[in-house]
């Protein structure tokens, strides 16, 4: 069992309690016979979960469990997932679901050239092989603004983003330039940029930026969101886990919040489609990524590729 249980180690208690802002006296306040460790650590787990829920109000219970487990597992007193979720429930820390109105962000009725889909049924095996792009809306006290994201299809890392008050091409272009700033020309020449057929991505300035760096261009062939599923999923996570739960007063504040949210998304939030790793970790790897979920049509014993 844990060092806390076996030896009541002062150094271990001091480290653990100090890490979460508690004194050893506070720890011992929660003693209950032989189960003092579990009972004492429970409020620490709840408090840490409360901290994460405050900053990340839509983070799913399973994701939050993985994060908290990584912090407390070494104590030997971390509850199982079901017990952890029950802790969240009794402490009012479950996700609150809100529905929002939707805004159109894609206009495919334009005169620009539309490119073919180069990534259909392609499973990336390295970072910077395929980037996927999309635009979504953000409601603020000043009105709606728009978030442009570029996500790596292999690692699911958001590599470029921008917030703007309109759907002008300049904001997706800003996100693209941020992303291109993270790679060299050789890497860019082996990269495919995939998007919908919206006028921003088909515009002369956006296409010119891609061609300047030798990036191959791929686009969806219809309005089916499955043709750009990873980009749609990244947008959905950002909206449902954060933006729908927040009241953002200004567009300027939105930019500040997005910087914080994307940092957490990339470096702390585990993703089931990459083996419950963070995108930052997966971005340093190559080869098949094991996903931690099955499609309804997958056989129970079938090894699943990344999704």
Residue ranges and their predicted role:
Residues 36, 40, 106-107, 195-197, ...:
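RNase H-like two-metal-ion nuclease catalytic core shared by retroviral integrases
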């Amino acid at each position: 069992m844990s060092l806390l249980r076996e030896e009541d180690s002062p150094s271990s208690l001091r480290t653990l309690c100090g890490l979460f802002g508690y004194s050893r006296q506070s720890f011992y306040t929660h003693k209950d016979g032989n189960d003092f460790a579990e009972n004492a650590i429970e409020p620490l787990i709840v408090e840490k979960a409360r901290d994460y829920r405050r900053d990340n109000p839509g983070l799913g219970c399973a994701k939050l469990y993985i994060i908290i487990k990584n912090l407390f597992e070494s104590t030997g007193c971390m509850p199982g997932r079901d017990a952890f979720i029950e802790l969240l429930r009794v402490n009012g820390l479950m996700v609150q679901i809100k529905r929002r109105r939707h805004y159109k962000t894609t206009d495919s009725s334009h005169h620009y050239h539309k490119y073919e889909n180069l990534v259909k049924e392609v499973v990336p095996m390295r970072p910077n092989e395929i980037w996927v792009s999309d635009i979504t809306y953000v409601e603020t006290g000043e009105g709606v603004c728009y978030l442009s994201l570029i996500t790596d299809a292999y690692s699911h890392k958001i590599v470029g983003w921008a917030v703007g008050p309109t759907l002008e091409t300049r904001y997706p272009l800003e996100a693209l330039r941020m992303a291109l700033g993270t790679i060299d020309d050789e890497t860019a020449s082996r990269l495919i940029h995939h998007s919908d057929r919206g006028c921003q991505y088909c515009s002369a300035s956006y296409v010119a930026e891609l061609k300047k760096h030798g990036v191959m261009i791929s686009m969806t062939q219809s309005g089916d969101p499955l043709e750009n599923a990873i980009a749609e999923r990244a947008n959905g996570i950002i909206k449902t886990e954060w933006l729908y739960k927040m009241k953002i007063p200004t567009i300027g504040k939105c930019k500040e919040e997005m910087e914080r949210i994307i940092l957490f998304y990339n470096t702390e939030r585990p993703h089931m489609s990459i083996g419950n790793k963070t995108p930052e970790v997966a971005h340093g790897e190559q080869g098949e990524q094991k996903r931690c979920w099955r499609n309804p049509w997958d056989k129970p014993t079938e090894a699943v590729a990344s999704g």
